[in-house]
Amino acid sequence: QVNLFDQTTPITVNNFLRYIDQDSYQDSTVHRSVPNFVLQGGGFKYEGTIPLDRIETFSSIQNEPVLSNVRGTIAMAKLSNSANSATSQWYFNLKDNSVSLDATNGGYTVFGQVTTEQGMAVIDKIAALERCGEVPVVNYTSSQCSDTSVDPDESNLVTVNNIVIIDADPTTAANLSPKSNTLIDNVPTPTPNPVPEPEKSSSGSLLTSLFLMVGIVGRRYRKKR
């Protein structure tokens, strides 16, 4: 389960919910995995061919870098050198990325956090999968990754089956203590490489394993509708 911080980052949460309401994330793929950094999705779908098809996006939103990019948080990916460019893509922080992401590019907006150890265990298992480039894959060899005559199919991808809001109560975040972003007013650090970039396309193979269908359950900390 993921708790969303509606009151702290209302613009971002409402944007995320808008994509959910439009079923934009249904059957989307986890298209980027960077060890000890981030696990990213929300940008592409597999429609029977490679490269993946981009999810249709709404207008970019205002950045809200109030909270810190610590392990277990979910944040919005965006274009490099463009603070207010987030649209549909999100990422989970696999470790404490506050130093590299809280002040860089205007700060990356954290808008929720994983609330259970079981939830993070699933994310860590996906992050530990083999990769083709930065795309996590299952039952797909390195030789297949480099063979341009062979493409992965749906069985080789990590798919987000659906995202469901299970609690819209505005008081659900009352007992949470998200870490504040105290670095945003500092001089920006050099952009880390790699950095979550929504425009970074993926080609090559993708993953799936026991986690072929990954359901993200959102609890509106709503601060939400």
Residue ranges and their predicted role:
Residues 1-202, 206-209, 218-223:
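Cross-family detector of peptidyl-prolyl cis-trans isomerase
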